[in-house]
Amino acid sequence: MSRRRRVVRRAVATEGCSGNVLLARFVNVVMHQGKKALAEKIVFGALKMAESRLQGESGIAIFNTAVANVMPKMEVRSRRVGGVTYQIPVEVREDRSTSLALRWIVKAARASRKRTNKTYMSCLCHELMEAYNKRGGACKIKEEKYRMAEANKAFSHFRF
């Protein structure tokens, strides 16, 4: 039996995000060195750019679809059995799946920022558009996780 206490989840403040908790979490993931106002400016600017590229779709709808397309359902976890470490495929909880999707989108946008000579806002917009269309760096990370889970399906009987 674990002696640790149950973790109490804090509610995310959604002041500037019009009550959208997912968008507030995304702003927090984009935020660097505590500069939340700058992170909000980047995120909302990227959503506005995406909205102008896709006529008829709101920026929030594009964002929600992009995150839903990147959210993983399976991942692998390491488990040591008899001196051998196995990669065991397990299902991902909803909150972890959302967190991973947000992190992967930001990671892909930062990687493309280093490769290209564009602003971070335009790179984030491009990555959101790619995720909306089920392409891009974040979707590649998701597919890679799925391939690992599929390759190690034989070890799924070693459940946690």
Curated annotation (Swiss-Prot):
Record's keyword annotation contains Membrane: no
Q: Which Pfam families match?
A: Ribosomal_S7
GO terms (BP aspect): translation
Q: Which domain of life is it from?
A: Bacteria
Is Ribosomal protein included in the keywords of this UniProt record? yes
- Give the InterPro entries listed for this entry: Ribosomal_uS7 (IPR000235), Ribosomal_uS7_bac/org-type (IPR005717), Ribosomal_uS7_CS (IPR020606), Ribosomal_uS7_dom (IPR023798), Ribosomal_uS7_dom_sf (IPR036823)
A GO cellular component annotation in the UniProt record: small ribosomal subunit
Keywords of this entry: Ribonucleoprotein, Ribosomal protein, RNA-binding, rRNA-binding, tRNA-binding
- What Gene Ontology molecular-function terms does this entry list? rRNA binding; structural constituent of ribosome; tRNA binding
Q: Please give the subunit comment from the record.
A: Part of the 30S ribosomal subunit. Contacts proteins S9 and S11.
Functional description taken from the UniProt entry = One of the primary rRNA binding proteins, it binds directly to 16S rRNA where it nucleates assembly of the head domain of the 30S subunit. Is located at the subunit interface close to the decoding center, probably blocks exit of the E-site tRNA.
The family annotation for this protein states:
Belongs to the universal ribosomal protein uS7 family.
What is the designated name of this protein? Answer: Small ribosomal subunit protein uS7
Protein encoded by which gene: rpsG
